[in-house]
Amino acid sequence: MTGGGLMQLVAYGAQDVYLTGNPQITFFKVVYRRHTNFAMESIENPFNGAPNFGKKVTCTIQRNGDLIHRMYLQATLPQVALQSTDGSGAQFRWLNWIGHNLINYVEIEIGGQRIDKHYGDWMHIWNELTQEAGKQAGYAKMVGNVPELTNLLYQGGSNCDNDCYGGEPLTSEVITSCAPMYTLYIPLQFWFCRNPGLALPLIALQYHEVRINLEFDSLNNLCWDYSNGSSDAHAIRNRVGQCGLAAASLYVDYIYLDTDERRKFAQVSHEYLIDVLQFTGGESITSSANKLKLNFNHPCKELVWVVQRDSYVSCDDSIINPWKGQQPFNYSDWWDRSVLESGYSVTRVEGMAGKNPVVTALLQLNGHDRFQVRDGNYFNLVQPYQHHTNIPAVGINVYSFALQPEQHQPSGTCNLSRIDNTTLLLTVSNNAVGTNLSSTVRVYATNYNVLRIMSGINFVLNACAAFMYGFALANHLCSRASCPANKQGQTV
């Protein structure tokens, strides 16, 4: 008996010409493309000096392969155990999202010139906007947002799990007196880390070293403790500080090319369209109405801003002790009580009590309104819904000039180099700037630039750098015919 599907096949009319007339593809014959031969390997690169809390370190990227792609900071936190001398009421916990919080800043430098600089705060915001739902729980484990680190330690609690002994592992509900040694894997988010087509060609940078400079945050911004066993209320933290980081290094994914492609990469010039971060520092505010001048340049994909109460990152024990530590990634206008109610190990913070401190926002370009005044939730909810993978936590605000700002392919920009005055007008809630309250506004911009890598063959390095950095293709910073001595290109 003939199947009913044939009825669909013969029901063909003039309207179908727009869909199936002169077909260009078939769904029933797979087509693939052959690729060049290559191999990948992740290799550990050590830091120069001893990495530790509050220290600045540098990693000179080893020339183990032809290109570099992904990078991960691997850092091991020391084991923390309460001692009887800490007192009966002693407590300790690592702060949430310790992996992001650990990084004060990280920057990439090529030939002595800084190309891009990221911050732990930005890495957390970027994760909130872009992380796929299926990876969020695993990513939280990678960066240490787990109960065994963020739950409070109490005197008389259970000891840490020991892998050398059998038995059922401790659950998050079990009270412990010990936080285990824990290795963090924090992925860096530079342009070449996110797209293999932008992998940085070490083989073409024959005369320039690539360095990663990183500053770890100080320990008092990473944990909370209380000790009533001595005159030192921070005896536990000081003991952890003496131990320091157990280990820290950089894991780099190297790409090895086959002979022909390797020769081509080494001999020809390269020009990469890259996206980098701009941040000019936080601005303190104490009033509800604020007018912020944005000193950004280059074609900008989007603006991202947060307003954070200064009390959330205070070092005053009388302020943070009721909340068991600082809340560096709380961008709402009230303390996050959900961390208390959930045992400190929430992987996201939608349940917080506070609201978006941005009541309204307006962007002006040379005195002209870019849009009408909008409610803060438009930037916290609608804009991320339109342009990003995730709708972020409360208080992360976005305005995108691009259709798809997460993608490398340009899909819209605003050239802020051609705008004399870019101004962000914010109305902020009284919970953020009320009586005796102050907050800090941080505005980030992602923009395009061009990285030029010139072949070292027949090249006078003293007269012209082997790589050039600047956006305008028409305004060449370097040419073989004319090259000002020692000109190193534009600074970000």
Segments (PLM) and residue ranges:
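Short, low-complexity Pro/Thr/Gly
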Residues: M1-V492
